[in-house]
Regions:
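Acidic/His- and Gly-rich active-site-bordering loop/insert found
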Residues: 1-79, 83-110
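Histidine/acidic-residue-rich, glycine-tolerant segments that coordinate divalent metal ions
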Residues: 42, 67-77, 83, 99-230, ...
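Non-cysteine beta-strand/loop elements that form the S-adenosyl-L-methionine
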Residues: 54-56, 65, 182-187, 339-344
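Divalent metal-coordination and catalytic microenvironments
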Residues: 4, 43, 55, 82, ...
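Metal-dependent amide/peptide-bond hydrolase catalytic core
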Residues: 205-414
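Sec/Tat-exported extracytoplasmic proteins
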Residues: 1, 8, 100, 147, ...
Length: 414
């Protein structure tokens, strides 16, 4: 964990981190596949008949130049605790790759270090498409497209606490927002800013008016939809003495369901269209794939039984729990049963310069134990508990319908 923390890398470019993880897993005698969605690493253990449990760790760091451990070149830092996830996944592999353990289990386990959980902005996406990434929004989405989860039956994920939690562990998946994004280009008309500004169409004024309209729309958002709107102006004219004829904005709509995301995106689009009409400009937009909302899942019995074996406090997810943030784990929850827990052991803010691991046992060791114990309980006794979870789970999408949804809504070209 400390080595990975000292060498942070951005999404889809985690080459050093991936090589480090692959070497460790090979050292355990596992069959390792690398270069998945550029940098993903998957190691297989047992490979026998029965359910597959896929344990996930995320490779990438977050852009945070102000963090004291930020890379001076790429500007990223492990201020979201992904290095702790990798440590937990590796620790679980150490515990499970034991002949005596294997003899008592049915099924298989995959240890999957995945790239690019953090949001990839529009400019980088264009480059990634040229590099052959079909769904460049996130690593998990691209890995679904590539079929790298085709053999998975149950997914185990973990993260540092993403909500205020006093206990050591939070078991289950709290519902989370999903989001969609757009790259909006506002076309106006250039004119001299002093001599004849009335002959111009100010693209920045169109943008400002649209954003003000969105502010006035907030009373139309239902509380249960947890809507959040974001606009970042990437460009607003070229010179100070000319009416801006072009503005470029990257937008994001967060909400708690796919329907709410779609409805709110339409409102945002109408704001830009209406402002452009009022000033005599035009709008061009490029829909960008986001993340799907996380579907709530309570604490599974196997996980709660496992955490009781640790010297740790915990609480279980409740249907009313909600996290306004987004993660591409949401996409997985629409296809697979995802058993999740979060953990403490850190201080400071997620994605902040003050994020710091304070309790290494709680942040690195105990999560590894909980992953291993949960996996063991899923696959022991002829994998009875794993089979029950798979039998009861009702997916929203399969791989084909998921990929078609992305193509239909976000124009992602493969």
């Amino acid at each position: 964990a400390k080595d990975i923390q000292s060498h942070p890398e951005p999404g889809f470019y985690e080459e050093r981190t991936a090589a480090h993880v692959a070497a460790f897993l090979r050292g355990l005698g596992l069959r390792v596949h690398g270069g998945l969605a550029r940098t993903g690493v998957r190691a297989e253990w047992m490979e026998q008949d029965g359910p597959n449990i896929t344990i996930i760790g995320e490779l990438d760091a977050i852009g945070c130049k102000s963090h004291p451990m930020a890379d001076p070149v790429n500007g990223t830092a492990h201020a979201c605790g992904h290095h702790a996830q990798i440590a937990a996944m590796i620790g679980a592999a150490l515990a499970l790759t034991n002949e005596e353990v294997q003899a008592s289990l049915s099924g298989s386990v995959s240890f999957f270090a995945v790239p690019a959980e953090e949001y990839i902005d529009a400019d980088k996406r264009a480059w990634l498409r040229k590099e052959g990434i079909g769904f460049p929004a996130s690593g998990k989405s691209e890995l679904i497209r590539l079929g790298e989860f085709d053999h998975s039956d149950i997914i185990l994920t973990t993260h540092v606490h993403m909500m205020p939690v006093e206990e050591d562990f939070y078991l289950g998946n709290a519902a989370c927002n999903g989001f969609s994004a757009e790259r909006v280009t506002v076309r106006g008309k250039a004119a001299h800013a002093a001599i004849d500004p009335w002959d111009g169409v100010n693209a920045l004024s169109i943008t400002s008016s649209a954003i003000q309209m969105m502010g006035l729309m907030r009373e139309t958002f239902r509380e249960e939809d947890h809507v959040r709107l974001h606009n970042v102006i990437r460009k607003a004219g070229d010179v100070i003495n000319a009416v801006p004829d072009e503005a470029v904005i990257e937008t994001k709509v967060r909400a708690a369901s796919l329907d709410a995301i779609r409805a709110t995106q339409e409102k945002m689009d109408r704001a830009y269209d209406g402002a452009a009409y009022a000033f005599g400009g035009t709008i061009e937009r490029e829909p960008l794939q986001g993340y799907m909302p996380i579907l709530h899942r309570g604490a599974d019995k196997v996980m709660e039984e496992s955490v009781k074996l640790l010297d740790a406090s915990y609480r279980c997810s409740k249907p009313a729990d909600f996290n306004n943030a987004c993660t591409d784990v949401g996409d997985l929850t629409h296809l697979f049963p995802v058993l999740n827990f979060t953990f403490g052991g850190f201080a400071g803010k997620l994605h902040g310069a003050d994020f710091k691991i304070m309790d290494e046992e709680l942040a690195y060791i105990k999560p590894a134990k909980l992953l291993a114990l949960t996996t063991y309980r899923l696959l022991c006794d002829q994998a009875k508990e794993a089979k029950k979870i798979c039998r009861e789970f009702k997916p929203v999408f399969n791989k084909e319908t998921y990929c078609q949804y992305i193509r239909d809504n976000f124009h992602e070209n493969e």
